[in-house]
Amino acid sequence: MVNDIIADSLTRIRNASMRRLEVTTLYYAKIVVSIVEVFKTKGFIKDYKVNDKDGKRSIMVQLAYDEQGKSAINEIKRISKPGRRVYKARSELKRFKNGYGTIVVSTSKGVVANDEAYKANVGGEALCSIW
């Protein structure tokens, strides 16, 4: 079993993106589904689907590429780790990479992107960044 399922999921997405794979499989967890949903709304992935095979759930993620075959993901990083939690106030969530990137934040309103957390006037735990 994986100790940090978020870091494992981000690594699987990063590796699949570097290998130019169309689809990758992630372990199922509610937090991972929430993060992948943010990636989808921001256009970093095409789509995702939760599979239930023999009682074991997994998440199939379709990666997004442009017409030239370049990945929509340039960099994906874990910010808050199990040994070192990182929290961001609302004022620290305004912009990331001049608006090209997104910080995924776990707030009291759920797992959202940094711009949505800023508009909702909440801060929270910065889970990962992507651009």
UniProtKB/Swiss-Prot annotation:
GO terms for biological process: translation. Gene3D superfamilies: 3.30.1370.30, 3.30.1490.10. The keyword Metal-binding does not apply. It comes from the Bacteria. One of its GO terms (cellular component) is ribonucleoprotein complex. One of its GO terms (molecular function) is rRNA binding. It holds the Pfam family Ribosomal_S8. Coiled coil: none annotated. Keywords: Ribonucleoprotein, Ribosomal protein, RNA-binding, rRNA-binding. Disulfide bonds: none annotated. Part of the 30S ribosomal subunit. Contacts proteins S5 and S12. HAMAP family: Ribosomal_uS8_B. One of the primary rRNA binding proteins, it binds directly to 16S rRNA central domain where it helps coordinate assembly of the platform of the 30S subunit. Belongs to the universal ribosomal protein uS8 family. This is Small ribosomal subunit protein uS8. The lineage of its organism: Bacteria, Pseudomonadati, Campylobacterota, Epsilonproteobacteria, Campylobacterales.
